[in-house]
Amino acid sequence: MAENNTLLRHFFAPGADADPEGRFGLNSKSRRRRMREIIGIVGKHRALEGFTPEEFRAMLEDLGPSFVKIGQTLSTRSEILPKVFCEELTKLQTECDPLPFDEMLAALDKEFGGRRKEIFAEIDSKPLGSASLAQVHRAVLTSGESVAIKIQRPGVKATMALDIDIMRTLARRASRYMKGEQMLDLRAVVEEMWATFLEETDFRREAANLAEFAELNRDCVFVACPKVYTDLCSEFVLVMEYVDGIPIGDADRLVANGYDLEEIGSKMLDNYATQILDHGFFHADPHPGNVIIRDGRIVYIDLGNMGRLSARDRAGFGDIIEAVGLKDPGALKDALMRFAAKKDNAAIDHARFLADLDLLLEDYGSCDVAEIDVGQFLS
């Protein structure tokens, strides 16, 4: 595509704002270059002609880590995509072509310098896992402990920053031609993506999350997370206890090892309610690739994306849950209205809202969790 493409020049003009923190060297030239790359990849996959689930996954992988993250989220949203697409996108949770081991060692040397061999007695060249953001290798400290090293992929932070900054610019510029209310939510979503990006790509934050999660759940005998070696962590490297176990999504293997799937689901839901309602500090990305079962315990192994709730928000969730338990549509409506960020009573058909809630409670109010199709519920 030509450099003077009218659309690209309009959206990514020289006066466009760069990233707010000014950390990634983003500018109109880098935006246009990346946008041409995105358009080229979409064109290569002939997306406008439609695609199979496999082609859609492959396109997201080619587009890079930001789009892989979006695909991971979509894999759990059967109310948005057909089931066959969701099933294919689950591969994005655990599968990604690994980088050469030499590149990972170079990244470690950049962080530790000549200390790497003083810290690690051995590092397995075969990765335990390779995701869009980072690669994990098993290692042994010189002190003898078995650990997992999470190493951020070189250059991935700058690419993700550029992608999200492009999304921000598109949303902001396009809003000039649309009603403000139509774009408000989209712009808020992009800003939330930026905040999540900053948190997930700074492994010092994940180290702090691991320590806080362990402390808050210390009395829960069936939930755990890896021990973190804070003094060995940095923005780009996380060192934590190596935890072996069965992925929570591997139902056949869990059953073969004597686990009760209903019991696991019940315990996980119980603890998740505790995280939200009591702690106000909860795992915000609990997809199957982030949770394993070891010795009867539910182990969260990736705490890069955590959420926090104020006391007011926790109380609001409690009111919603109580109303569902009582199968009271009026109380549920009031609880949802109190919890909403914005309330425009004039824009709400209260009678229809109550009728819809009544049907919702009739369908789901007395269901076991295992009986609920979450995607269908949300739709």
Regions picked out by a protein language model, each given a short descriptive name:
Residues 1-135, 158-188:
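N-terminal accessory/targeting segments that precede structured cores
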Residues 14-30, 191, 234, 243-245, ...:
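Helix-rich C-lobe and terminal helical cap/extension of kinase-like folds
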Residues 90-124, 207-219, 255-274, 377:
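A short, contiguous, amphipathic alpha-helix enriched in charged residues
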Residues 139-140, 286:
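Conserved beta3 strand of the Hanks-type protein kinase catalytic N-lobe
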Residues 161-164, 168-171, 187-218, 224-262:
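Conserved structural core of kinase catalytic domains
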Residues 280, 285-287:
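Conserved catalytic-loop position in the HRD/HxD motif
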Residues 289-293:
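Hydrophobic residue at the +6 position relative to the catalytic HRD Asp in the kinase catalytic loop
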